[in-house]
Amino acid sequence: TGALEPLDFRHLMDNLYELRSLNTEVDTYSLPHPLDSSNMNPQHWARLARIVADRYNAYDGFVILHGTDTMAYTSSALSFMLMNLTKPVILTGSQLPIGQPRTDAKENLLTSIELAAACDDEGFARVPEVCIYFNGHLLRGNRATKQNAEGFNDFESFNYPHLCDAGVSFTFRTHHILQPDRHLPLNVQTCMNTNVVVFSLFPGIQECIVRHVLAAPELRGIVTRSFGAGNAPQNPWILKLLRDASDRGVTIVNISQCETGCVEMGLYAPGMQLQDAGVVSGYD
């Protein structure tokens, strides 16, 4: 049909002759049924976390090949599932399939492997956290966002510096990289409550729609994408519905629709009213 589909990892290895020249021992593990990333869900995240955990003591680092559409969701989820990490878990992929002449897959994968194997002078991993590597940049996994569906600069971390930039050599920003307590064991948390909704505020938003969403009996969390520094329309019904949900034990987190900047609900009156209604700031 000409449509892009997931492929078996063996096909990738057949096209990646450069892998043999790396001074790194690489083992591979392939899921039996490759999955388009648009079909990822929390059960798949938990499975990935368990795969890492089951092999954690056998390897110095992990590279996960993942479709770009939901890669940022997976990297963020894994960053909370894999607690007390002392080894890199790096997600990467490509915009063009590896068989195409201008593919970005080779550089992304080869550099990800090198970063996953990188150690400091004491033999500790340079980047012991969940990350995304793409187009020369290593990003914190729970700060990365897919920003481009066409170019090779697919991901960006708007409110947090790159952990490493890959040029002729690697430039690590050590003071921005998590430093783990190496005495603590890996703590894997795979239980997630999926009764969460994300909705964006917009001028003219209707009470009947918001009321219907917030009235869901199993609702446990709301991510509200608000205006600017965390503001919302000062409609009394919005504040009442949010307050009622908060009183029922629903966690409501306020994030901005802006790509950069921070939620400061105490800055303007509309934001202060959200705070009074029990809404929690998502900061940056």
Regions found by a protein language model. Give the residues of each.
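C-terminal non-catalytic interaction/assembly regions of soluble proteins
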Residues: 226-284
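ATP/NTP phosphate-donor binding region
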Residues: 1-54
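Short Gly/Thr/Asp-enriched flexible loops that form oxyanion-binding sites at enzyme active sites
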Residues: 64-87, 234-241
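Short glycine/serine/threonine-rich phosphate/pyrophosphate-binding segments
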Residues: 1, 69-75, 105-109, 231-234
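Internal gly/pro-rich beta-alpha loop/helix module
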Residues: 91-168
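Structural motif
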Residues: 60-61, 221
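Accessory alpha-helical/coil subdomains and C-terminal extensions
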Residues: 5-20, 140-229, 234-235
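Short beta-strand segments
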Residues: 64-66, 90-93, 131-135, 200, ...
